Amino acid sequence: MFQKHLQKASDSVVGGTLYVVATPIGNLADITLRALAVLQKADIICAEDTRVTAQLLSAYGIQGKLVSVREHNERQMADKIVGYLSDGMVVAQVSDAGTPAVCDPGAKLARRVREAGFKVVPVVGASAVMAALSVAGVEGSDFYFNGFVPPKSGERRKLFAKWVRAAFPIVMFETPHRIGATLADMAELFPERRLMLAREITKTFETFLSGTVGEIQTALSADGNQSRGEMVLVLYPAQDEKHEGLSESAQNIMKILTAELPTKQAAELAAKITGEGKKALYDLALSWKNK
C-alpha cells in the first residue's frame, strides 16, 4: 500500500514545473510521501543550505542535484531556474525546515517562475506556525503571523504596543539570544497577558510553556535550558476589559503616578492607594499611551 501511494505521487510529477516542497521542522519522520516522490524525481533541487538538505536526502537515499538559492542570490538564480523549466526539467524548492517562502527564501523565485508562464505547485507539509497554534488551545479562525520579532527593543515595543488590545492570537518567531529581552519588553506592556512558548517543536527536547508573560519569564530564568533552540511564541488574545468602572480619583492618581514612574510600578502603587485592581489601572495607562 505504501509503495502504491508513493508510485502514484511520483507519476503525478511533471516536467516544466516548480514544486515548492515543505520539509520536516525537526523530526525527519514528518516528511510526506508526496514530498519524497517529488524530491526523488526532481532534476534540480533548490536549497537554502545545501548541507542541511543533503542530510535530509541522504536519510531517504535520494540523490539529487542541489543548487543554492538563498536570500542574497535568489533573484539572479530565478532566471537560471526558469531556464531549467524551459528545458522541461522538474525543479523542487526546499528551505532548511518547514515551508519555503515563509520567513525563508522562495517568494522571489515563485513570482519569477509564474511571470515566465510556468506552474508553481505547493507540496504541503510541516509548519511551525500551525504546529504551535494546534496545541495552544486558542479558539476561532483568526490569527496574525508576524514572522521574526524585530531585533531592536524600540522597534519591538512599538510593535507590541499595537497588540495591547488585539482580539486575536499572534504567532511569532524568536531566537534564543533575544528571548529574554523580548519577554522583558512584553512584560512592560502586558505582564498578565497569556503566552505560550513552543521550543524545539517535533525534536527531542520539545517543550511547551504556557502562562502569563511574567510566568514565562520566571520559568526561563529558573532553567537556562528553556532558552535554547528554535522558538515559536503564541500571544493569546487580549481580554476585553473596560475602564469605566474605575473611580475618577483612581484615574487621576494613576495619571499623576505614570508621569513619574514606570507603568507597572505606577499601577502597583495606585492599586495600594485606591484599592482598585492593578490590572485595570495598568490597562488604563496603556490606553493613554495608545491614543
From Swiss-Prot:
Gene3D superfamilies: Cobalt-precorrin-4 Transmethylase, Domain 1, Methyltransferase, Cobalt-precorrin-4 Transmethylase, Domain 2. Its EC number is 2.1.1.198. The keyword Zinc-finger does not apply. Its main location: cytoplasm. One of its GO terms (cellular component) is cytoplasm. CDD domains: RsmI (cd11648). It catalyses: cytidine(1402) in 16S rRNA + S-adenosyl-L-methionine = 2'-O-methylcytidine(1402) in 16S rRNA + S-adenosyl-L-homocysteine + H(+). GO terms for molecular function: rRNA (cytosine-2'-O-)-methyltransferase activity. Belongs to the methyltransferase superfamily. RsmI family. This is Ribosomal RNA small subunit methyltransferase I. The lineage of its organism: Bacteria, Pseudomonadati, Pseudomonadota, Betaproteobacteria, Neisseriales.
